[in-house]
Amino acid sequence: MSAKNLIRAAAFLMFACAVLHSFAWTRAFADFSPEVRQLAALLWFLLGIDWAVVAGLWVMGASQGVAARRLLLFSAVVPIAVAVGLILTIGPLFFPIYLQLGAAGLLLLGTFRLA
């Protein structure tokens, strides 16, 4: 698989994370107390948008190739930080951790293979 296609696959996986996250929107209301429900809903919404934007930036970075290498590498911080946060708060058995790490891994592999 070419480097650009690996980056596009990472973007697809990150966008899938955003879609799955937005489908679970109503769960945010059930899992939190009424005092913090508004804040939880806002954070839930912002994470979905964040991941969709990152996926879009990765697609644009793949089309630019080597010129976007530094920015692509820097943007890998987003899914890695999310995965680490989920491991620390929920535990390592939570499936979305591996979606985030998979997206970051594909991105890093594709970015390092850019010629």
Q: Which functions belong to the PLM regions below?
A:
Residues P34-A41, L93-A103:
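Non-cytosolic membrane-interface motifs at loop->transmembrane helix junctions
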Residues S63-Y98, G110-A115:
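Membrane-helix boundary connector in multi-pass membrane proteins
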Residues A103-G110:
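Small-residue-rich segments of transmembrane alpha-helices in multi-pass membrane proteins
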